[in-house]
C-alpha cells in the first residue's frame, strides 16, 4: 500500500478504503510510520505553514485518539464510529486540501461528495455476519468507491487502484467501468 501511495503523494490527494474501523487507524499509522522510517514524511505534509498550523489545531480539537495521532502528519481517518464533529472535521480538512491521505471505511463512498484524484481499495473482502463468512464486495460497492476518483467537477482524470487476491483479479477486470472519467490502470 505504501508504494502505491508514494506514487501519488505530493501530487494528488489519495482516498484509501478499508473494510473495518480498526483498519482505518492501522493503515494510516502504518503509512505515517513507514514514511517516518523512510524519511519521506515531508511529502505528506502540506507545503504551507498555514496549512500545517490548521492540521496542528485540528489534531488538538479532535476527540478520536487515532485521528489526533495522524492529523498533524497529513493523514486522516474517517469511519462511522467517530463523533460527527470529528467526521466533519476530517471532511472539511480533506476538502480544503490540508490532508493528503484519507483512510476511510465505505462511509465516504455513500452520501458524502468528497472526491480524490486517486482511490485505493485495500482489500476486496468484507465479513458478512448473515453468512458467517468473508465475501467479495459487490460490483455496486466497488464502483461507488471508485467513483470518488477524478470527479468531473473537481478533476479531469482519476485513478482507481484495487488491492485484491490474485485469484479475484479476473472478476474485477470484468467489472464494467461506467465512469468515462475514471481509468483503472492498476489492479494488484
Which residues are covered by each model-predicted region?
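Conserved small/polar residues in nucleotide/adenosyl-binding loops
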Residues: 180-186
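Conserved nucleotide-binding/hydrolysis micro-motifs of P-loop NTPases
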Residues: 21-24, 82-83, 108-110, 125-127, ...
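Conserved C-terminal RecA-like helicase domain
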Residues: 22-101, 134-140
Amino acid at each position: 500500500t505504501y508504494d502505491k501511495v508514494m506514487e501519488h503523494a505530493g501530487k494528488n490527494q489519495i482516498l484509501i478504503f478499508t473494510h473495518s474501523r480498526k483498519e482505518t487507524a492501522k493503515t494510516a499509522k502504518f503509512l505515517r510510520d513507514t514514511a517516518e522510517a523512510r524519511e519521506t514524511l515531508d511529502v505528506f505534509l502540506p507545503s504551507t505553514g498555514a496549512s500545517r498550523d490548521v492540521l496542528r489545531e485540528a489534531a488538538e480539537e479532535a476527540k478520536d485518539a487515532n485521528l489526533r495521532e495522524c492529523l498533524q502528519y497529513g493523514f486522516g481517518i474517517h469511519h462511522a464510529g467517530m463523533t460527527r464533529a470529528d467526521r466533519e472535521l476530517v471532511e472539511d480538512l480533506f476538502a480544503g486540501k490540508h490532508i493528503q491521505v484519507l483512510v476511510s471505511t465505505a462511509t465516504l463512498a455513500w452520501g458524502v461528495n468528497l472526491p480524490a484524484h486517486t482511490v485505493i481499495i485495500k482489500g476486496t473482502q468484507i465479513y458478512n455476519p448473515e453468512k458467517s463468512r468473508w465475501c467479495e464486495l459487490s460490483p455496486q460497492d466497488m464502483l461507488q468507491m471508485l467513483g470518488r476518483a477524478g470527479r468531473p467537477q473537481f478533476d479531469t482524470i482519476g485513478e482507481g487502484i484495487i488491492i485484491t487476491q490474485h485469484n479475484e483479479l479476473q472478476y474485477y477486470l470484468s467489472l464494467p467501468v461506467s465512469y468515462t472519467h475514471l481509468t483503472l490502470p492498476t489492479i494488484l
